[in-house]
Amino acid sequence: MEEDQELERKAIEELLKEAKRGKTRAETMGPMGWMKCPLASTNKRFLINTIKNTLPSHKEQDHEQKEGDKEPAKSQAQKEENPKKHRSHPYKHSFRARGSASYSPPRKRSSQDKYEKRSNRR
């Protein structure tokens, strides 16, 4: 009996708390207070991957530092013989990769072109 009364009392308290929160929400925001946010949620996986891919890789830097520690100072002639190769950005087009020809996207057909092709098929 006591457990039932205790549960009922807690339920009443929770309902009163919720009603007070609803009252303050209605006073401050009105009916819009119960509507969902119109903004879409952020795509956090996309943002994290974009940040990781745009920042220079820490592994490559650590690897280069370790190699530099192992090898003693090189002479100036050896440094000039082995220049570092620059890595191209994966999303930027390099002139070598594109070749000499530049391609344009396909042309949109007008409604007249569509009708002419249909009449030619018949």
UniProtKB/Swiss-Prot annotation:
List the record's Gene Ontology CC terms alphabetically: cytosol; nucleoplasm
**In the UniProt record, does the keyword Phosphoprotein occur?**
yes
* Keywords assigned: Acetylation, Phosphoprotein
Q: Which residues carry this modification: N-acetylmethionine?
A: M1
Keyword Acetylation assigned to the entry: answer is: yes
Task: Tell me the segments the record calls region Disordered.
Answer: 48-122
Please list the residue ranges that the record marks as compositionally biased, kind Basic residues: 84-96
Basic and acidic residues composition-biased segments = 57-83, 110-122
What is the top-level taxon of the source organism?
Eukaryota
* InterPro entries referenced in this protein's UniProt entry, alphabetically: POLR1D-like (IPR038948)
Q: List Phosphoserine occurrences by residue.
A: S104
Q: PANTHER family this protein is in?
A: RCG42593, ISOFORM CRA_A, RNA POLYMERASE I AND III SUBUNIT D
The name under which this protein is listed is: Protein POLR1D, isoform 2
